[in-house]
Amino acid sequence: MNCSKFFILCFSFLFSFAQAQNLALTKKKNLNTRIELGFDRGIQLSKNFPILKSGEQFNLSISKLYGSHFEAGIGVGYQNLGDEQFMPIYLLLVGKTKAGSGPYIESSVGYAYGENSKYEHAVISNFEGGKYFSTGIGYEFNIKNQYSFLASCNYIRQQSQVKHYEGETVNYIENLTFDLIVFKIGLLLK
C-alpha cells in the first residue's frame, strides 16, 4: 500500500501546486479544491455472509464551477477498512441549490485500486479493486469568499474481486461488494 500512499501524496502536492498557481486567477477560472475526511460504517457482501466494516477515508478533489449551481471535477482518495484498503480515482459532480452557504448533492463514479492484507502474500489468490460509486447530500458553510466548511453524509458502493488460481488459470472468482454510509467533514478552497 506504500505505492498508494505515495500516489496520494504526489496528487496532494499537484493539487496544492495547481491551487497556488491559480490563486490570482481563481475568480476567472472558478477552481475549487476539496479536502475531506470521512468515517465509514457498513457491510461487506459476499456469497458466504455479510461482514460488518468500519474505517476511515481521505478524499482530495479539484473541480471547476460552471455557473453558480454546478461543478464537475476529478478526485482521488484513500479508504481504510481494516484488512482492505482502496484508492479510488473518480469523476465528481456537485449540484448546489444556491451560491454560497447552502445544501448540495454530490455524486462520484470511478475505479478503486484495492489491496487486502490477508491476500498480500498469497500465491493462489489475488485481491483486486473494482468499480466505485458514491452519492450523498451535504451542507456548505461559507466562511469567507475563499473558504467553506463542508459536512455531508454519503452512500458508497465499492466492488472488488478475489481471484482464486489453480496453477496459472483462474479457478474461481469471488465478487465482493462493500456498502457503506460515510460521514464526511471537509474544507473547500475556492
List the model feature ranges, each with a label.
Residues M1-N30:
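Cleavable N-terminal export/targeting peptides
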Residues A24-T26, L45-I51, N80-E84, A122-F127, ...:
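Outer-membrane beta-barrel domain signature
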Residues L25-I43:
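Transmembrane beta-strand segments of Gram-negative outer membrane beta-barrel proteins
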Residues R41, E56-F149, L189-K190:
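Gram-negative (and chloroplast) outer-membrane scaffold detector with strong preference
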Residues Y119, K163-Y165:
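Outer-membrane beta-barrel and related beta-rich outer-membrane complex signature
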Residues S148, Q161-K163:
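Outer-membrane beta-barrel porins/channels
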Residues C153-N154:
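Internal, hydrophobic beta-strand segments that form the core of beta-sheet-rich folds
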Residues N175-K190:
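Outer-membrane beta-barrel "beta-signal"
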